[in-house]
């Protein structure tokens, strides 16, 4: 039975089709306060879109808190950070409040955006990150993520010398 389950999961776990240079799929999702955000509204500035499985779970909390701690550096660079999961705006509100998360969390409850980015998993979104440039093109895709160091890895890619900050 376990082998069958693994096979079914692998069958539905398709890789990421989007690559650097591709146009990032536009989306309109609601944040924790009920405000709609469209990716196209942020053209002209770089955007980090990170998909994560679930609010207030150990790995997702570590990842969100790392982004939280580095948020001043993202702001300094003019980079907008969006975390996306299938959780409801209410769940996002609790998660943000509990961990003092300063950036926007978006609700993809119908999995449409995760599917368009190739980040949809069978039950939860895959942990994957896209860096989108000022023109709306994907500049980097992270399919393998270390929750504790991922934020710094992105800052390094964006040109911040994070080793000087520790």
Indicate residue ranges for each PLM-predicted region.
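Short, internal strand/loop/helix patches
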Residues: 82, 93-128
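Short, small/polar residue-rich loop motifs at catalytic or cofactor-binding pockets
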Residues: 23, 46, 124-126
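Thiol-/selenol-based redox modules, centered on thioredoxin-like
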Residues: 125-166
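N-terminal targeting signals for export/organelle localization
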Residues: 1-30, 166
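A short beta-strand-turn-helix
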Residues: 28-47
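Hydrophobic beta-strand anchors of alpha/beta hydrolase catalytic cores
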Residues: 48-49, 81
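Conserved redox-active cysteine motifs that mediate thiol-disulfide chemistry
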Residues: 51-69, 73
